[in-house]
From Swiss-Prot:
The gene is L1. Keywords: Capsid protein, Disulfide bond, Host nucleus, Host-virus interaction, Late protein, T=7 icosahedral capsid protein, Viral attachment to host cell, Viral penetration into host cytoplasm, Virion, Virus endocytosis by host, Virus entry into host cell. Self-assembles into homopentamers. The capsid has an icosahedral symmetry and consists of 72 capsomers, with each capsomer being a pentamer of L1. Interacts with the minor capsid protein L2; this interaction is necessary for viral genome encapsidation. Interacts with protein E2; this interaction enhances E2-dependent replication and transcription activation. This is Major capsid protein L1. GO terms for biological process: endocytosis involved in viral entry into host cell; virion attachment to host cell.
């Protein structure tokens, strides 16, 4: 007998209300054939490779920290194209359109020779090499699960993981790192227990340390021994770009495109000193439930009677540094960005996040600290010389910018307002100034006691949305040129795109080159 049964599977229905769709900038941005070349000065920075150097009282910074393993975040400020006095006023209609910049080309120049830098710690927590052990490391006489000795730290150095990377966008790059989390109220966090950790997202600022082989973590909050990593990150937070978050950003402003090259290998294998926080499951758990599951204890009288520490870790190496695998000093062209923003520089600014430790040489500077000339020294005495370390970096940035138009249509303005309402304020849409009165009151000594108080509410300046964040500000408001063929990146752009210079109504533009080939004749037999 056939009977009706309710369906066991799920039925998926379309949403009852239409879902808002974010348009790509290519759908409403109108590109012109006017290109500009922008370039920066030679950008130099000098400092100590491992830490900040302060005066004796510690209240004045004398030498900043400049490490090859730091992020360099350049904030490029561009001029407002709507304020340009264009020779050809037919380029756009200010009543119906606004002008914006689009990035079409980029070259990040790096000076200084290639070199490998080393980092380390004079009190590094490594007990012994565990790759080629020739004797079992015994514990001290304090009992089980104690440190190998009171102090096992050694002076150790190594080269970091090799990394070359840059991220281009119109907002700061989003980074990720692991940090200490707040424990639940019901869980009593006892002293000495491992705290909970969580993944956090923050902007990558200029000077933030990159991952050098120990992970992206807040070492200041999660390593109280101050001896598990090198000096340059022991009191820092190492960040790594959150590519997954930026790739799924609905607007795609943080990352138009990026280039990345990382490499490392485990050079040495060590074991930590100190008490073991998490014991290996054995006979001490549940009356022997896990006995002989992970190890079989040693016999009495043997060094293996007391199990050793299992806190293994490697020190990585970046290996060979070669000019054959360089991401810098070469042009990159943006044809299609990974997100909805295809290179449009909203708010007339651009963020370039760079990491490059292939030029990681640290200078050693020795200074004679005694009175008298150096030629009078008879015998070498190390106490008569002071040793200093410095690290230098050299950058130069070149851009190819394209002038674009934004139509002031309702659907376009609605999306821009949802994305960033401050853009519409900068464009002064709907602002109608009141007519000036023919007579204005102007006091000469407005700050004196004889006159009235000045205005208590002066007009507020526009607040920086990234106030409190540290970037390397580069002003390009007066560094633009229409003569692309006068610059290296401009000539490369004209050549690779098959373009040539033209002049229309006094405004320089570029156009595609036409073919000069004649019609091929058919050969007679």
């Amino acid at each position: 007998m056939a009977v009706w049964h309710s369906a066991n599977g799920k039925v998926y229905l379309p949403p009852s209300t239409p879902v808002a769709r974010v348009q790509s900038t290519d759908e409403y941005i109108q590109r012109t054939n006017i290109y500009y070349h922008a370039f920066s000065d030679r950008l130099l920075t000098v400092g100590h490779p491992y830490f900040n150097v302060y005066n004796i009282t510690g209240d004045k910074l004398e030498v900043p920290k400049v490490s090859g393993n730091q992020h360099r975040v350049f904030r490029l400020k561009l001029p407002d194209p709507n304020r340009f006095a264009l020779a050809d006023m037919s380029v756009y209609n200010p009543d119906k359109e606004r002008l914006v910049w689009a990035c079409r080309g980029l070259e990040i120049g790096r000076g200084q020779p290639l070199g490998v830098g080393s980092t380390g710690h004079p009190y590094f927590n490594k007990v012994k090499d565990t790759e080629n052990s020739n004797a079992y490391i015994t514990f001290s006489k304090d009992g089980q699960n104690t440190a190998f000795s009171k102090d096992d730290r050694l002076n150790t150095s190594f080269d970091p993981k090799q990394i070359q990377m840059f991220i281009v966008g119109c907002t700061p790059c989003i980074g990720e790192h692991w940090d200490k989390a707040v424990p639940c109220a019901k869980n009593d966090q006892q002293t000495g227990l491992c705290p909970p950790i969580e993944l956090k997202n923050t902007y990558i600022e200029d000077g933030d340390m990159a991952d050098i082989g120990f992970g992206n973590m807040n070492f200041k909050a999660l390593q109280d021994s101050r001896s598990d990593v090198s000096l340059d990150i022991v009191n820092e937070t190492c960040k790594y770009p959150d590519f997954l978050k930026m790739q799924n950003d609905i607007y795609g402003d943080a990352c138009f495109f990026y280039a990345r090259r990382e490499q490392c290998y485990a050079r040495h294998f060590f074991v930590r000193g100190g008490k073991t926080g998490d014991d290996i499951p054995g006979a001490q758990i549940d009356n022997g439930t896990y006995k002989n599951q992970f190890y079989i204890p040693g016999a009495d009288g043997q060094a293996q009677k007391t199990i050793g520490n299992a806190m293994y870790f490697p020190t990585v190496s970046g290996s060979l540094v070669s000019s054959d695998a360089q991401l810098f000093n070469r042009p990159f062209w943006l044809q299609r960005a990974q997100g909805h923003n295809n290179g449009i520089l909203w708010a007339n600014q651009m963020f370039i996040t760079v990491v490059d430790n292939t030029r990681n040489t640290n200078f050693s500077i020795s200074v004679y600290n005694q009175a008298g000339p150096l030629k009078d020294v008879a015998d070498y005495n190390a106490e008569q010389f002071r040793e200093y370390q410095r690290h230098v970096e050299e950058y130069e940035i070149s851009l190819i910018l394209q002038l674009c138009k934004v139509p002031l249509k309702a659907e376009v303005l609605a999306q821009i307002n949802a994305m960033n309402s401050s853009l519409l304020e900068d464009w002064q849409l709907g602002f109608v100034p009141t007519p000036d009165n023919p007579i204005q009151d102007t006091y000469r000594y407005i700050d004196s006691l004889a006159t009235r108080c000045p205005d208590k509410n002066p007009p507020k300046e526009k607040e920086d949305p990234y106030k409190g964040l540290h970037f390397w500000d580069v002003d390009l408001t007066e560094r633009l040129s229409l003569d692309l063929d006068q610059y290296s990146l401009g000539r490369k752009f004209l050549f690779q795109a098959g373009l040539q210079h033209t002049t229309v109504n006094g405004t320089k533009a570029v156009s595609y080159k036409g073919s000069n080939r004649g019609t091929k004749r058919k050969r007679k037999n």
